[in-house]
Design a protein with these regions (language model features):
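Membrane-interface transmembrane helices that cradle and orient dolichyl/undecaprenyl
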Residues: 30-35, 71-86, 194
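Transmembrane-helix motifs of polytopic, lipid-linked glycan transferases
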Residues: 11-32, 70
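Membrane-proximal, lumen/periplasm-facing interface regions of secretory-pathway glyco-
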Residues: 250-297, 305-322, 326-327, 350-353
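Hydrophobic, aromatic-rich transmembrane alpha-helices
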Residues: 116, 175-196
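Short acidic/glycine- and proline-prone juxtamembrane loop motifs at membrane-interface regions
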Residues: 53-63
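Membrane-interface alpha helices of multi-pass inner-membrane proteins
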Residues: 85-101, 131-133, 213
Length: 494
């Protein structure tokens, strides 16, 4: 980092926000860049709630917004003059979009859909192929890790349909963009038909983002900020049309401008301790320093949340990781296999476990819950393989199944570990509904040596549920919960 501490983390976010504003400004036609337009541009930009927030909140949305602005700038120039410079800008922007967030791919697709004539242009294909080459390392990483992002977004996040997901979507979008901003954008798109390819692309991105994520509410909760990339085209169409529509210009000054007062109040509140501790932007350091005081030189192991093991080393400079389970989301810590470096090492487990955890008080008086272990053992490196093709499942039936177990780590795995024992469970998953069934190991084993594979068998009773809706997997369960140790397969029922 260029700077230490919070500024070091947020510095590039600030730079990208400034860059995003500059690039967006230069996307406006030169003849329209007047003092009046400048005034309206900054009103709309500052009043766009999440766009403004990502000027100081460091997330992948900051580069997403920057590269969206750069891509639209490049596309506008490309439409007007297909030269080498605009092609280079589009290649850099498209690559940056994909690496920032997968929503960036939607920006690219919607622009192409708005102008299918691009598909007949040789230079377009040169840009597309070059971009594909630049993102090949990421595609290979996805392949090497069994496409974790796709599995997470397509499968893991899917839940049963709830009307609540649908009904919350529109209010969340109003909060994301500012009701006055999105309302004006909808009015402009309804009132003025897009007549040029670039303007058409702006309309497609706005409508496409809101429609696409609106449809995805049928499979689960949609985070409000997932549509934030549509802010850039909203700013552009409002500022562009305000130069010829005096009523729109007045509306921007009077209503969108007035809403900035509420945003300023919100920013002031953020600077205080009035918000719940979980979402405060400061005062977090004390908790992690207190945890480090209790943990000493031992790495701190968290469960479930990726925020804690990220913030702990940031504030203390000490090691930390998270142990995920089927009850929580897969994190970057899992993909990087952070847990492996702490296997068999002393550690402090910062979580509540009945009969194990204690409450410790730091010198500052802060209470920290957790317990010490002298030899950490996790279950994420154990892999189960099984075949259910010849098994017919029915409710309450006792099933015996062959099981192949592989230990991919450099350390022996002990089932009856003195501090962190594990047990095999059969797991039934129906979207977010998870049922764990205990099983009997009919050919018992005490441990699995490093890089060893063994064969055994388990016996379990099928749960009394509608089996057609569930997939079956096998998991190792510990104090951290059932871990992801196998594929989940469809079963045959009678």
């Amino acid at each position: 980092m260029i700077f230490e501490g919070n500024l070091g983390v947020r510095f590039m976010t600030i730079v990208m926000q400034i860059g995003c504003l500059v690039v967006t400004w230069f996307t406006i036609n030169k003849s329209l860049r007047t003092i009046q337009t400048t005034y309206l541009f900054f009103i709309v930009s500052f009043a766009s709630v999440m766009f403004s927030a990502y000027g100081f909140i460091t997330t992948p949305d900051a580069p997403l917004l920057f590269f969206t602005a750069l891509f639209l700038f490049g596309y506008k120039e490309y439409v007007e003059s297909k030269n080498l410079t605009t092609s280079f800008i589009l290649i850099i922007a498209a690559t940056g979009l994909v690496y920032s967030k997968y929503q960036g791919l939607l920006v690219i697709v919607l622009v192409i859909l708005s102008n299918l004539k691009l598909l007949k242009n040789t230079r377009f294909w040169v840009i597309a192929i070059t971009t594909l080459i630049l993102i090949t390392p990421h595609l290979y990483w996805q392949y090497a890790n069994e496409f974790p992002s796709i599995k997470y977004h397509v499968l893991a996040r899917a839940t049963a349909f709830k009307w609540g997901f649908v009904f919350e979507y529109l209010p969340n979008q109003l909060a994301t963009f500012n009701p006055f901003v999105i309302g004006a954008a909808v009015f402009v798109m309804y009132r003025y038909k897009a007549t040029e390819p670039f303007e058409k692309a702006l309309y497609y991105i706005i409508i496409g983002f809101i429609a696409f994520f609106g449809v995805t509410t049928i499979r689960g909760h949609v985070e409000p900020h997932w549509t934030v990339a549509a802010t850039i085209p909203m700013i552009l169409i409002l500022v562009n049309k305000s130069t010829t529509d005096t009523k729109l210009a007045t509306y921007i000054k009077k209503y969108i401008g007035s809403s900035i007062i509420l945003l300023l109040i919100a920013r002031i509140i953020i600077c205080t301790t009035l918000l719940p501790e979980r979402i405060q932007f400061h005062s977090k350091q004390q908790k992690y320093l207190a945890t480090q005081e209790i943990a000493g030189t031992r790495p701190v192991i968290y469960s479930g949340s990726f925020q804690n093991p990220s913030l702990y080393p940031f504030f203390t400079g000490k090691n930390s990781t998270v142990i995920s389970s089927l009850m929580s989301r897969i994190t970057q810590f899992d993909l990087w296999k952070f847990q492996q470096q702490f296997q068999t090492k002393k550690a402090f487990i910062a979580m509540h476990v009945d009969g194990k955890s204690n409450t410790y008080t730091s010198k500052s008086g802060m209470k920290i819950e957790g317990f010490y272990v002298d030899s950490l053992q996790t279950t994420d490196h154990i892999r189960f393989n099984f075949d259910v093709k010849n098994i017919l499942f029915s409710k309450a039936k006792t099933v015996e199944m062959e099981l192949s177990i592989t230990n991919s780590s450099n350390h022996e795995f002990i089932m009856d570990h003195r501090e962190l024992p594990a047990r095999i469970e059969v797991v039934w998953i129906n979207k977010k509904d998870i049922i764990c069934t205990p099983c009997i190991i009919t050919r018992p084993f005490a441990s699995i040596k490093a890089h060893q594979s063994i064969k055994t068998a388990i016996q379990f009773v099928v749960p009394d549920v509608n089996l057609e809706n569930y997939k079956l997997g096998v998991s190792l369960s510990s104090i951290f919960g059932p871990s992801m140790n196998s594929e989940f397969v469809t079963i045959e029922t009678k």
